[in-house]
Amino acid sequence: MRSNLLALSAGLMLFSVAAFAQGDDIKITNTWARATPGGAQTAAAYATIESTGGDRLTGASTPAAQKAEIHEMTMIGNVMNMRPLDGIDLPPGQAVTLKPGGYHIMLTSLAKPLREGDTFALTLDFAKAGERQVTVTVAKVGAMGPGGKADSGSSMPGMTMPMQH
């Protein structure tokens, strides 16, 4: 009986360690969004995500918007295209950056305008790691990074061209 209890205890400890290790597998940094100009109903959230063991970002949600979707922007010819994705693969040990002109979390039907300096909660869903909640800081309109530096558009060629969604 005692050996069964020891075996059960050891098994539970190993399970707890494995669950803890999986919980630490995802690192999310540099979470930010741009402030929205008056009346805008859409915005995008950005972050840097790293998974030590590999994972897949599969979805997102936030009280700041009715809908949050994973999107990607790409240039096709002279047209910037934005399309929803069912997920983003996170290769083991490599950081994946969600940024303007690339991967991002598209927020639609905003609950209220995003104002510079505000924060909001964002839940990211992962295939292996489950849900992770982060706090997103709102940078100025036109910011190109979490520090809030505005950009003239020169680093995003084609942004003045037609965009398809």
Enumerate the language-model features and the residues they cover.
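Short, surface-exposed loop and linker segments with low hydrophobicity and enrichment for Pro/Ser/Thr
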Residues: 5, 19-21
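Compact, glycine-rich, soluble single-domain proteins
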Residues: 23-165
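Bacterial N-terminal signal peptides that target proteins for export
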Residues: 1-8
